[in-house]
Curated annotation (Swiss-Prot):
This is V-type proton ATPase subunit G3. The modification N-acetylmethionine is found at M1. V-ATPase is a heteromultimeric enzyme composed of a peripheral catalytic V1 complex (components A to H) attached to an integral membrane V0 proton pore complex (components: a, c, c'', d and e). The keyword Membrane applies. Keywords: Acetylation, Coiled coil, Hydrogen ion transport, Ion transport, Membrane, Transport, Vacuole. It comes from Arabidopsis thaliana (Mouse-ear cress). Its main location: membrane. It is found in: Vacuole membrane. The keyword Membrane applies.
Length: 108
């Protein structure tokens, strides 16, 4: 009878060991699936973050370029206005003299 109990006990231990192996295997599979899911989510978040940073950078760069262009145009306009004022002040006396001469001269 002890041999039957021993055989039954051994069989029960083997069955328990197989069940434990299945449980461990299922746990490993679940762990790997969770790790893969976490990795995929992390990669997605990194890509979204990278895209957002790239968009912010492009916005900043284009804004800086527009500001620089506007400042450059303002500076060029100021220089041209100054040049025109200087040119007009140099010739304005001659133009006034020419107009006065033209208006006061009578045709014969």
């Amino acid at each position: 009878m002890d041999s039957l109990r021993g055989q039954g006990g051994i069989q029960m231990l083997l069955t328990a060991e197989q069940e434990a192996g299945r449980i461990v295997s299922a746990a490993r599979t679940a762990k790997l699936a969770r790790m893969k899911q976490a990795k995929d989510e992390a990669e997605k978040e990194m890509e979204e973050y990278r895209s957002r940073l790239e968009e912010e950078y492009q916005t900043q760069v284009s804004g800086t370029d527009q500001e620089a262009d506007a400042k450059r145009l303002d500076d060029e306009t100021d220089v041209r206005i100054t040049n025109l004022k200087e040119s007009s002040s140099k010739v304005s006396k001659d133009i006034v003299k020419m107009l006065i001469k033209y208006v006061t001269t009578t045709a014969a």
